[in-house]
Regions:
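Juxta-kinase regulatory segment immediately upstream of eukaryotic protein kinase catalytic domains
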Residues: 2-65
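Conserved ATP-binding subdomain of kinase catalytic cores across diverse folds
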Residues: 47-152
Length: 152
């Protein structure tokens, strides 16, 4: 069974954990391994499921992940089931600061190629979701960005 967001799953947040990056609000909490977990309003509704021990614990992640096609490190992984609920996640490893692999691009065409940070990607997705730009009759339905995990 896949869990869908509902208003009864929203937990109250103390104001000192709420932050804003590039126009996107996040609840910033420390993960069990000492890293940082930034949850969007979509992610806060799944707070318990998104704790890293429920999807990124090394044995669980290694056993349950499926690599998705593409040039970057993107995986599908289910969360562990909690109280009869689970989520199917798409996990993308950040490649900011890495060199672009030349095997996938020609140097001449993509000389100045860079990777977006997760903050930039989430801001762009939220901008598309809001429909603030472009024709008002066109809505772009995207996946709901849940959160950004920064390892210790």
């Amino acid at each position: 069974m896949t869990f869908h967001p509902s208003t009864d799953s929203i937990i109250p947040l103390p104001p000192d954990i709420v932050t804003n990056v590039l126009g996107v609000s996040y609840a910033h909490v420390q993960s069990s391994d000492g890293g940082d977990l930034y949850l969007t309003p979509f992610g806060v509704t799944h707070f318990d499921l998104l704790q890293i021990e429920n999807w990124y614990e090394p044995n669980w992640f290694r056993s349950n992940k499926r690599r998705l096609e593409g040039t970057s490190a993107v995986h599908w992984v289910p969360t562990k089931e909690l109280k009869g609920k689970k989520l199917d996640l798409v996990v993308k490893n950040c490649r900011v600061g890495e060199d672009v692999p030349l095997a996938t691009h020609t140097l001449k065409e993509f000389l100045n190629t860079e990777f977006n940070s997760p903050w930039e990607e989430f801001a762009l997705v939220m901008e598309m979701r809001s429909g603030a730009f472009g024709p008002s009759h066109i809505a772009i339905r995207t996946q709901e960005p849940l959160g950004i995990y920064v390892p210790p």
